[in-house]
Amino acid sequence: MGWRTVLISGRAKLDLKLNNLVIRKEEIVKIHIPEIAVLIIDSTMVSFTTALIEKLIAEKVKIIFCGKDHNTIGEIVNYYNKHNSPLMIRKQISWENNAKQKVCQEITKEKINRQAKLLEFIGNENANLLQEYKSQVQVGDVTNREGHAAKVYFNSLFGKNFSRSQDNPTNAMLNFGYSILLSIFTREITSSGYLTQLGIFHENQFNYYNLSSDLMEPLRPMIDNIVYFYEPEKFEKEEKIAILKIMDEEVFVGKTRYTLLNAVNEYCKSVFLALEKGEEQLIKFIDYEL
């Protein structure tokens, strides 16, 4: 799989030549397709050939489209990702409920842990409160520690008047970052032969990416960290580039250093193994420096 993220903005024509993505603008740029992990189309003035799309899909390149407001509006999902996908889906359906609940508990605890570490990093005293919430997470999160932690966390980062429902550059940048994470996880899940629709916690019948939403939770603070220090006053190309730099981040799984894409692969494999064996301690979470 590739590792590069390519962002296309403005007027452009894209086509295929000798296994290269050819970008025709004022100048012509060629990028070797096997190097590409994600292609983001951030313009309604981009045209491309079906031969290119076919090749990108075959190489498992995630193609994401943005609307006029520069927010992501959709992506292309490959129908056929792994030769034994029917077997993997049967395994997915047979994951025991107890195993799913225990895995969800660990994911929720790790998400709150990462939120607490970010608050500690910026010197916010509410980091200790979030660590308390983490220790109180029960199976099924029946006391909604995740929700309580989120309220304290976002108010600590962006102010007491901040709400995730507001239409502002901060939320736009957060949403874009989360959508990139979602696409990374969707790419990994489908490449492993599983269905993104069948979540282990998220069960929204209208959400095509329930499982992706479940697994990405501990990495959301990576995006929050970028947005907090960027303090966006607008949401345009520069802000997107700042978010996309996470693709080049070096992170850790255990003591081994990985790029983010490879780390997501290791993390997802460990979650699937934990679900299959019913042993939540097998999960290998991603660690990263702030």
Predicted regions and their residues:
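Active-site helix-to-loop segments that bind/position phosphate- or nucleotide-bearing substrates
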Residues: 2-12, 26, 58, 70-290
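Glycine/small-residue-rich interface belts in oligomeric ring/scaffold proteins
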Residues: 35-84
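N-terminal ordered "arm"
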Residues: 8-50, 54-55
